[in-house]
């Protein structure tokens, strides 16, 4: 079975756009709003023979290459369009040990029936350009076991040969540097009876492929290959001695756990980390074992044994390329203070261990201050630099850390760790707010709350979204005429309380409300009246509730269904709007949201039908937006089109050039224009992109280019303080800001 080769795609860094579009184009420069990390970095791959060459993969945010000169990670997959969002989940990375310029990516986010097949991306120039090879395989870059690996490997003796382990499709081989692939039918151990469940707790299939370079000679395929499969209570490590033609289970193996990661030392010792679950679903047991591949002898070298009272497993293990006895291993799910996780260090092949963090490790959070709120977790890859025994890295759910004095552990000294994620931006934007005055931007993101960005090029200082501190922030709004009043809603992170917070000084300080509509009110949407006096919160699955005393008391709004998103008029402090798009209803309040009157929603081409694909539900489509500075002026941004009303929603006019929409927002008017600039994500005149209009949607210009697409984009907002500036909120590539390129 052969893959289909694709086109050659150029991958560039932050560069001015060169654009061609039917509606016109304006070159923009793009940069990330600096958060640093913000998502799961689930794998790091060092090139074994080229100093400074290393790559990182993420579960939903693509892959990165380390830039040694700039001392930052650079994204490699920003060219992926919306249609290929699935490929932003990188299941595995492989480098060619004999050619430092070649790198391979196995891409695909989910294995469910709704998700398209994945692809192998091949590069001969360290990821500057890629060739795409479609394969009949689904990858699970954002599924359980995504931190295992590496599933993809290049034969160190013959770079033409690659092996690929998959979750549900068995073992595959390529003999032409990844251009075509054939299933290895002799490897029959490909299935497991695993209880059905969500993707974050499912089977992982084959989790690593390891070649033994000592078994062959340069220029010919290596005979000995090891494959680990995430099975439990049965054989899960297999060996081939004939280049993959036949396979046998390795005798004596510890089958009571699942293998997670493996490293082959220079002396032929195979080190494997084990757990009762692939992770990051919870592990209840596990260990670290080594196999002397010369003698076939197994040894249990677990640093800290799990118990019934202290259940956990082991995520990863790594060995020093310069010293086959020097190891580090990482725990997963280990209970204790600050999350309980630890690294363990051995310099005698695992006979004895020292805890690295418990032994006095210190951490510098200054490159990403927000991580000081979050325990170290999800250490699913640990690596020792093959050119520097003191330099080690480990990954986390928000990026990772590195040290340059790992060997000090051996002398009983303290290690110093710092954030290593500069350049990696993996947050998911749930809302964007650029107020008329004050901070450039306030972000609402998944998992790590969000930030007030006074400086777009520096990470926000610690604590700027505290009191309360959220995990997810789902809604944020400010008063149109009093923008220092800002309210945000979400769900409190562990150890914190309160699911709604407000600021009266533009985000410099925050406090929770005294009460909430119901004891469990959380998430949902928030609206703030133009004067800041009335707040309307629709908590998740709940009634629309109103407060006029900053949350001291709440009342239920009348005349509007539960769960309906409400927005405020940007001029009239008593007016609010809401919509039930598929029911053809518009709701209007002129009494500060005490009650809503229902009106027919009259669209010139009829109502859209529910169901089918209408984009990501967290995006900015299928919403109404109130125009800044114009009372009663509304834009209806449906997934299938854009509509405008200047009479409080009595009538709407369709903007015919827009045929698909994922996000919508306003920015400062162009010089001499009497209307705010409009920004949208979607399709205009058949061209997909991010667009700006300076004339109320009569004409549009594309402002991104094919090198800057970022897969799925959820939200867009202009800046009311600076014409042309736009903020783009992605699904896994962070938040970006763009400005017109200087001529």
Language model region names:
Residues 16-20:
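Hydrophobic alpha-helical membrane-insertion segments, chiefly the h-region
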């Amino acid at each position: 079975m052969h893959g289909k080769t694709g086109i050659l795609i150029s991958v560039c860094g932050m560069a001015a756009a060169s654009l061609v579009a039917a509606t016109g184009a304006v070159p923009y420069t793009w940069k990330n709003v600096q958060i640093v990390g913000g998502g799961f970095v689930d794998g790091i791959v060092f090139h074994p023979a080229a100093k400074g060459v290393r790559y990182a993969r993420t579960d939903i945010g693509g892959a990165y290459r380390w830039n040694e000169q700039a001392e930052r990670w650079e994204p490699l997959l920003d060219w992926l369009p919306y249609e290929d969002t699935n490929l932003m989940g990188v299941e595995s990375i492989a480098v060619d040990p004999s050619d430092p310029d070649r790198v391979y990516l196995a891409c695909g986010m989910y294995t469910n029936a709704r998700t398209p097949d994945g692809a192998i991306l091949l590069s001969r120039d360290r990821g500057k350009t890629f060739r795409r090879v479609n394969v009949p395989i689904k990858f699970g870059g954002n599924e359980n076991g995504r931190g295992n690996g590496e599933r993809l490997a290049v034969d160190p003796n013959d770079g033409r040969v690659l092996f690929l382990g998959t979750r549900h499709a068995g073992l595959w081989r390529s003999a032409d540097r990844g251009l075509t692939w054939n299933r290895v039918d002799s490897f029959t151990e490909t299935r497991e009876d695993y209880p059905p469940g969500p993707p974050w707790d499912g089977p992982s299939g084959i989790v690593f492929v390891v070649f033994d370079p000592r078994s062959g000679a340069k220029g010919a395929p290596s005979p000995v290959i090891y494959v680990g499969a995430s099975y439990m209570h049965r054989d899960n490590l297999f060996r081939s001695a004939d280049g993959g033609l036949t396979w046998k289970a390795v005798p004596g193996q510890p089958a009571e756990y699942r293998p997670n990661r493996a490293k082959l030392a220079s002396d032929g010792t195979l080190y494997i980390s084990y757990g009762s679950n692939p992770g990051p679903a919870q592990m209840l047991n596990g260990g670290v074992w080594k196999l002397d591949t010369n003698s076939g002898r197994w040894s249990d070298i677990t640093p800290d044994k799990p118990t019934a009272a202290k259940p956990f497993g082991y995520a990863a293990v790594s060995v020093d390329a310069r010293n086959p006895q020097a190891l580090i291993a990482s725990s997963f799910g280990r209970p204790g203070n600050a999350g309980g996780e630890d690294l363990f260090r051995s310099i005698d092949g695992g006979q004895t261990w020292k805890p690295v963090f418990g032994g006095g490790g210190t951490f510098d959070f200054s490159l990403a201050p927000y991580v000081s709120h979050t325990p170290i977790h999800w250490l699913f890859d640990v690596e020792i630099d093959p050119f520097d025994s003191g330099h080690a890295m480990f990954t986390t759910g928000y990026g990772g850390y590195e040290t340059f004095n790992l060997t000090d552990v051996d002398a009983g000294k303290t290690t110093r760790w710092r954030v290593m994620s500069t350049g990696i931006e993996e947050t998911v934007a749930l809302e964007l707010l650029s107020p008329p005055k004050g901070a450039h931007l306030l972000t609402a993101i998944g998992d790590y709350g969000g930030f007030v960005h006074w400086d777009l090029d520096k990470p926000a200082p610690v604590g700027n979204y505290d009191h309360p501190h959220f995990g997810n922030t789902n809604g944020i709004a400010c008063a149109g005429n009093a923008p220092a009043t800002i309210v945000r809603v979400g769900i409190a992170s562990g150890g914190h309380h309160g699911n709604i917070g407000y600021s009266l000084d533009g985000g410099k300080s925050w406090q929770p409300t005294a009460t909430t509509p119901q004891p469990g009110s959380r998430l949902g949407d928030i609206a703030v009246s133009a004067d800041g006096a009335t707040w309307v919160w629709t908590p998740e699955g709940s009634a629309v509730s109103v407060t006029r005393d900053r949350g001291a008391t709440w009342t239920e709004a009348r005349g509007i269904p539960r769960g309906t998103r409400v927005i405020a008029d940007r001029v009239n402090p008593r007016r609010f709007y809401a919509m039930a798009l598929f029911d053809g209803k518009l709701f209007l309040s002129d009494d500060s949201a005490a009650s809503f009157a229902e009106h027919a929603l009259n669209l010139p081409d009829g109502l859209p039908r529910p169901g089918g694909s209408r984009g990501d539900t967290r995006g900015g489509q299928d919403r109404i937006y109130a125009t800044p500075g114009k009372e009663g002026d509304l834009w209806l941004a449906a997934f299938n089109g854009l509509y405008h009303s200047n009479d409080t929603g009595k009538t709407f006019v369709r903007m015919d050039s827009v045929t698909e929409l994922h996000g919508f927002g306003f920015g400062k008017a162009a010089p001499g224009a009497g209307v705010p600039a409009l920004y949208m994500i979607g399709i205009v005149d058949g061209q997909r992109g991010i667009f700006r209009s300076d004339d109320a949607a009569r004409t549009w210009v594309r402002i991104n280019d094919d090198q800057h697409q970022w897969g799925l984009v959820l939200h867009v907002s202009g800046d009311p303080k600076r014409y042309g500036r736009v903020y783009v909120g992605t699904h896994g590539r962070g938040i970006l800001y763009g400005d017109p390129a200087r001529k």
